[in-house]
Amino acid sequence: MNRYKIVSLVLAIALLASLTHLMVSQDEGHGCAKKCSAESKSGVVLQNILSRKSVRSFADRPVSREQIDTLLRAAMAAPTGRDMRPWKFVVVEGRAEMDSLAQRLPYAKMLTEAAAAIIVCGDMSVTDSHGKPSTNWTFDCSAATENLLLMAEAMGLGAVWTGVHPYEERLVAVKSALGLPEHIVPLNVIPIGYPKGEPHPKDKYDASNIHYNRW
């Protein structure tokens, strides 16, 4: 084999080695990108969950219809037993209506400062394919509420869960104030707005509450 052929062969082998290394690096990089992306996404989600807090003091700043719609889209993405979706939502924006609710509900006085409120309700007329009403509406509506609260946190808004169901006097007050039909039961009232000040979340993690395999 002459010198020219030897040099060509060496160059070809070197080129092949370089291409192989490049392909392996790209595969590893692609795998890392997918892994890093997943880790980044999970980190953002966890941080948002851990940052959520109950906000009871609000700045004098409006919340747009687009923001409310985003909150409701998040709420209705919640899990629901047998896909029955027994939830209904009442959005209150008027100052007079907000103040009226605040007067009627002892634990929702912050409505006088909030920009809006969303009342999460269960629809007792919703039935499954066998005509049976939902027995899990409180679970489904609670899941929707938590989605809403987490979305509010992610959007820089503040919100707080104020309970209505199963307290009879609160049920009567909210149904009367909002003109709810008999088959609509309010689970809670969620005041919404921009936080006043810098409220801080509570670290509620407690390893003693965890059991593996059995108690």
Give residue ranges: language-model regions.
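Acidic, surface-exposed loops and disordered segments
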Residues: N2-W215
